[in-house]
Amino acid sequence: MPKTMWKPGTFIYPIPAVMVSCGDMEISNIITVAWTGIINTNPAMCYISVRPTRYSYELIKNSGEFVINLTNRKLAFATDWCGVKSGKDVDKFKEMHLTKQTANFVKCPMIEGSPVSIECKVKEIKELGSHHMFLAEVLAIHADEKYIDEKGAFDISKCDLIAYSNGGYYTLDKKIGKFGFSVQKKKTNKRKQKKWEKLKCSNSKGFLLYTI
């Protein structure tokens, strides 16, 4: 089927809708960011892109720190609200009834209600155009214990995380596979893998009998 061609734009969807906290425990702000992601594995690095005109831009640039807080259905309203209101005018933590949580390595607060909070240290700022990209090293990851399973792994299916796509917020549906599943060999039932055993030849009928 033919595809419709559009002019260049931002159409890589879905992407995370995160709440980035910045500043310190006294003077802090939350900026909602969709231009964010992973850029390196070792060392673990991520990025956020922010317009220089945003109130949070100077807070992040001056401190060189920020926290990425993942969002879920419960935080959807606050996520959107913190993206359309300016920290110059309102205290977003207070207005959205969000609780500040002390981080381990950075001075800016984490958001207590977030399923996962990621402490980040800015390593470089790239001025790209409409947005400046903050390249940052991940210092620590804090996951809410209620989302940790009995094996100590993070169970993302319990978080009810939200994503942003073409102007809307969406919840993640369900897991349909895991990394490498396309080349993974199917597990066979060991009970059906019993070796064939050759029995004694029947003198009367003169044939070999096999059994599974």
Regions found by a protein language model. Name each.
Residues 207-210:
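Aromatic (phenylalanine/tyrosine) cluster motif
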Residues 1-196:
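Basic, polyanion-binding surface patches
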